[in-house]
């Protein structure tokens, strides 16, 4: 992008666990916290080139990968108890945040983490 003189947006998919910690998720949380720091630093490094860098931090999203976990009542109840809006995310929720960050509507947004978490990190 720099060599071509292209201004734009880099969007990294992180996790709500990049904002908070999670029991029995030490390595996962560490990797997502690293992504948050990396993205903030890259936002500063690339700003002079007109390149914005942000992250999208979703909560649990209903996918083929998460369906088996959500089938376990105890796990699902725990997850839902942490989400004030009362439901897990959908892939469209994440896609909408990415679309916003990729568009000119976010031309003043860089170094930010867009939390698509139903309020998990507000608790």
Predicted regions and their residues:
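Alpha-helical segment proximal to the catalytic Tyr-Lys
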Residues: 3, 44-48, 107
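Active-site helix of classical SDR
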Residues: 6, 31, 39
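Active-site loop immediately N-terminal to the catalytic Tyr-X3-Lys motif
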Residues: 7, 20-26, 48, 86, ...
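Residue(s) in the substrate-gating loop at a strand-loop-helix junction
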Residues: 15
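Hydrophobic alpha-helix immediately C-terminal to the catalytic Tyr-X-X-X-Lys motif of short-chain
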Residues: 34, 38-42, 46, 56, ...
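Short, flexible catalytic-loop segment of classical short-chain dehydrogenase/reductase
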Residues: 36, 57-68
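C-terminal substrate-recognition "lid" of short-chain dehydrogenase/reductases
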Residues: 52, 87-116, 121
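Catalytic Tyr-x(3-8)-Lys segment
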Residues: 73-93
